[in-house]
Amino acid sequence: MSGDKDFDKDSDVTVITRTTPQTKKPQPYKVLMLNDDYTPMEFVVLCLQRFFRMGIEDATKVMLQVHQRGVGICGVFTYEVAETKVNQVVDFARQHQHPLQCTLEKA
């Protein structure tokens, strides 16, 4: 080392590299409302307005999709939010003695 002219003992150079953590976006989940023969259409619209903050026109469109196709998409959310909304709708329907069902699936 005595022959190395580029080596400096007194040099206190510190290199700091900053890395930004790579965070993944959360997996989106669709909340689906399922058709049944007993829940009134008005109640379905009420649920869509109340729990998914839809206006009357959007809620009616989704309700008709549920009625005609058997299933309708209420929205796309993170898993925790989707699960909460499903539980809210099902609990609200039970309280009002309706068999309305919601489920979630990966978007």
Curated annotation (Swiss-Prot):
Residues 1-21 are annotated as: Disordered. Pfam families: ClpS. GO terms for biological process: protein catabolic process; proteolysis. InterPro entries: ClpS, ClpS_core, Ribosomal_bL12_C/ClpS-like. Residues 1-12 have a biased composition (Basic and acidic residues). Involved in the modulation of the specificity of the ClpAP-mediated ATP-dependent protein degradation. NCBIfam families: PRK00033.1-2, PRK00033.1-5. PANTHER family: ATP-DEPENDENT CLP PROTEASE ADAPTER PROTEIN CLPS, ATP-DEPENDENT CLP PROTEASE ADAPTER PROTEIN CLPS1, CHLOROPLASTIC. Binds to the N-terminal domain of the chaperone ClpA. Belongs to the ClpS family. This is ATP-dependent Clp protease adapter protein ClpS. The gene is clpS.
